[in-house]
């Protein structure tokens, strides 16, 4: 197949066309040359024979004038023999007016003398008195040759007295033509050989730049734009090669710009905080960034090529064609396991002609925003509820007092006591809300001090131990002093809140344990406060630090809690670069863990 491909190449075609043109040209020239040469040689031959015959005619006329027709036979024979010495003459006969052969130059035909010649051309010449000629094939001993027969009548006093019959060997002329044709054919063959060789070189000068451009085109199709076509001259092909090099350079620059823009676009799409999905005009997903995959919780191969509306679970809502008309956004639950909510906006990729080539979906994660909004609504609802409950209670007691209960010496003090307790609870609630608001706005000032934590925690435990006679406090505190830096007032609030909750929810033989451990490697310490209370269900442990969250709302409200204590504690601990969390087993108790940074202070570091 390689030879067939080579045969079909432009290089071979140019050589073939070049050779064919040479062959056609030489054939035309050869045909014209040989035809004219043949005509010229034949005309010259016949002209010579005709002149020769004219001379012989004149000589015979003289013989007849001198000796008459009876005594002229011998002289005519001698005269014919004299003229027959030429090589091209085959035979000469003289035939009288009665078609009787008078003389002949050929020895083998001497027996025909005085016999009648039965030749139509002779008869025609004698009867018409005009010369004629024709070609015949005759064997002179070496095979049949072409012979030109020429008849010329002899006239004396304008009367035909006889006819000169001449057979001339015209075959030599044709042999000469054949030799010339053979020379011409050999010359043509040599010329063709030289033409083929030169044709290959000439065609190569034309096809080499074209081949280079073809190879460069193949390289360009593979993404290689660095090669350049060699320019061999200033002709049209050279100009084409120059234009091709300029085109290759511009394509290379355009490709580089396109690749740069593509990389930039890929980088932007990859690192966008929003999910991006791009489809073809049929809605099949072709591009998806990492954020979108993360939102769906799927691998790339599980989403590429799938129908976008099916992936978004919107195929029952509307059709793909409606995206172009509908600019509304949608809230979708993309990942139910993680509770991820995204706002989806669609846009259409449209050409200038109006033809739609694809669609783009932008997924904006609004989970946190929705959660904040939900928490805000819950917060407002909780605050409203927490304020409405004591206000309703206070309003009822005040109305009772207004209606005369103040006169009852037993009820009036009770009503006033309940009103005061509810007022104090509202004050605590408002104070907690104000403190949380300051922390949210980062306007709550923290005054840190270097604190001996051992002394600090023991002082708090002692205070609670004195007021809670029914609770046992167990201490596991290192003897080595642990120094830390925090705001003592705010951290006191944290530990008071945790210890109070531990005492509130303990049951039976109430017991609160304190465990303190230091990790010098990380300059951290961990405080664990454990009770033997009712415990917290495992699915609610992480929620106890949320605002207004209560595991047992009725019991918490009965004990005077606002539901904000642990939320405030979490804000304070995190403001000190710490962490607070809980572990609990329902029915066995709860452990609150607090980690805080601690300071490594040597004895020489204290100022005297």
From Swiss-Prot:
Keyword Ribonucleoprotein in record: no
Domain called HAMP: residue spans: 204-256
One MF annotation (Gene Ontology) recorded for this entry: metal ion binding
Cell compartments where the protein resides: Cell membrane
Topology term for the membrane: Multi-pass membrane protein
Residues annotated for Zn(2+) binding in this entry: 271, 274, 364, 368
Database matches in SUPFAM superfamilies: ATPase domain of HSP90 chaperone/DNA topoisomerase II/histidine kinase (SSF55874), HAMP domain-like (SSF158472), Homodimeric domain of signal transducing histidine kinase (SSF47384), PYP-like sensor domain (PAS domain) (SSF55785), Sensory domain-like (SSF103190)
SMART domains reported in the protein's UniProt record: HAMP (SM00304), HATPase_c (SM00387), HisKA (SM00388), PAS (SM00091)
PROSITE patterns noted in UniProt: HAMP, HIS_KIN, PAC, PAS
Signal peptide: none
InterPro entries documented for this protein: HAMP_dom, HATPase_C_sf, His_kinase_dom, HisK_dim/P_dom, HisK_dim/P_sf, Light-responsive_reg, PAS, PAS-assoc_C
UniProt domain Histidine kinase: residue ranges: 382-600
Disulfide pairings: none
Keywords of this entry: ATP-binding, Cell membrane, Kinase, Membrane, Metal-binding, Nucleotide-binding, Phosphoprotein, Transferase, Transmembrane, Transmembrane helix, Two-component regulatory system, Zinc
A Pfam short name: PAS_9
GO biological process annotation, one example: osmosensory signaling via phosphorelay pathway
PAS domain segment(s): 261-331
PAC domain residues: 314-378
Record function comment: Member of the two-component regulatory system WalK/WalR that regulates genes involved in cell wall metabolism, virulence regulation, biofilm production, oxidative stress resistance and antibiotic resistance via direct or indirect regulation of autolysins. Functions as a sensor protein kinase which is autophosphorylated at a histidine residue in the dimerization domain and transfers its phosphate group to the conserved aspartic acid residue in the regulatory domain of WalR.
Entry-linked NCBIfam families: HK_WalK, sensory_box
Protein name: Sensor protein kinase WalK
Organism this protein belongs to: Staphylococcus aureus (strain Newman)
């Amino acid at each position: 197949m390689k030879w067939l491909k080579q045969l079909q190449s432009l290089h071979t075609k140019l050589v073939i066309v070049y050779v064919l043109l040479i062959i056609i040209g030489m054939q035309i020239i050869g045909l014209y040359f040989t035809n004219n040469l043949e005509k010229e040689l034949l005309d010259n031959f016949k002209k010579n024979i005709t002149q020769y015959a004219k001379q012989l005619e004149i000589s015979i006329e003289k013989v007849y004038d001198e000796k008459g027709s009876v005594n002229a036979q011998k002289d005519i024979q001698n005269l014919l023999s004299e003229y027959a010495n030429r090589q091209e003459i085959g035979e000469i006969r003289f035939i009288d007016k009665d078609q009787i052969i008078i003389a002949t130059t050929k020895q083998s035909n001497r027996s025909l003398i005085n016999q009648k010649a039965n030749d139509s051309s002779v008869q025609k010449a004698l009867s018409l008195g005009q010369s004629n000629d024709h070609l015949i094939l005759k064997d002179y001993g070496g095979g049949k040759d072409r012979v030109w027969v020429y008849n010329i009548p002899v006239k004396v006093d304008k009367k035909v007295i006889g006819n000169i019959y001449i057979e001339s060997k015209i075959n030599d002329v044709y042999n000469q033509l054949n030799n010339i044709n053979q020379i011409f054919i050999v010359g043509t063959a040599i010329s063709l050989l030289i033409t083929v060789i030169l044709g290959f070189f000439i065609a190569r000068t034309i096809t080499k730049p074209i081949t280079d451009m073809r190879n460069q085109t193949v390289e360009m199709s593979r993404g290689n734009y660095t090669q350049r076509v060699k320019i061999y001259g200033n002709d049209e092909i050279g100009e084409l090669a120059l234009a091709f090099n300029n085109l290759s350079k511009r394509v290379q620059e355009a490709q580089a710009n396109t690749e740069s823009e593509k990389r930039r676009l890929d980088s932007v799409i990859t690192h966008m905080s929003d999910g991006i999905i791009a489809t073809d005009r049929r809605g099949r997903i072709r591009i998806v960034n990492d954020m979108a995959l993360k939102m769906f919780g799927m691998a790339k191969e599980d989403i590429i090529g799938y129908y976008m509306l099916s992936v978004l679970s919107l195929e029952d809502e509307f059709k793909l064609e409606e995206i172009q008309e509908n600019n509304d956004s949608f809230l979708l639950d993309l990942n139910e396991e993680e509770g991820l909510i995204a706002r989806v906006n669609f846009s259409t990729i449209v050409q200038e002609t109006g033809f739609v080539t694809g669609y783009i979906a932008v997924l904006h994660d609004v989970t946190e925003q929705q959660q904040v909004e939900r928490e805000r609504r819950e917060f407002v609802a909780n605050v409203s509820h927490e304020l409405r409950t004591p206000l309703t209670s206070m309003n009822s007691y005040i109305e009772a007092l207004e209606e005369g209960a103040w006169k009852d010496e037993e009820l009036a003090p009770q009503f006033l006591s309940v009103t005061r307790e509810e007022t104090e609870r509202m004050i605590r609630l408002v104070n907690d809300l104000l403190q949380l608001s300051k922390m949210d706005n980062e306007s709550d000032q923290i005054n840190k001090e270097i604190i001996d934590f051992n002394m600090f925690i023991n002082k708090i435990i002692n205070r609670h131990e004195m007021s809670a006679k029914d609770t046992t406090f167990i201490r596991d505190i290192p003897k080595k002093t642990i120094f830390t830096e925090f705001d003592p007032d705010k951290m006191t609030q944290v530990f008071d809140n945790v210890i109070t909750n531990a005492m509130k929810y303990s049951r039976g033989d109430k017991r609160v344990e304190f465990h303190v451990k230091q990790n010098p490697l990380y300059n951290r310490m961990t405080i664990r406060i454990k009770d033997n209370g009712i415990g917290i269900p495992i699915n609610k442990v992480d929620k106890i630090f949320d605002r207004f969250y209560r595991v047992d709302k009725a019991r918490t409200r009965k004990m005077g809690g606002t539901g904000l204590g642990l939320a405030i504690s979490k804000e304070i601990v995190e403001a000190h670069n710490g962490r607070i969390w809980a572990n609990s087993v329902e029915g066995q108790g709860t452990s609150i863990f607090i980690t805080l940074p601690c300071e490594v202070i040597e004895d020489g570091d204290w100022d005297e």
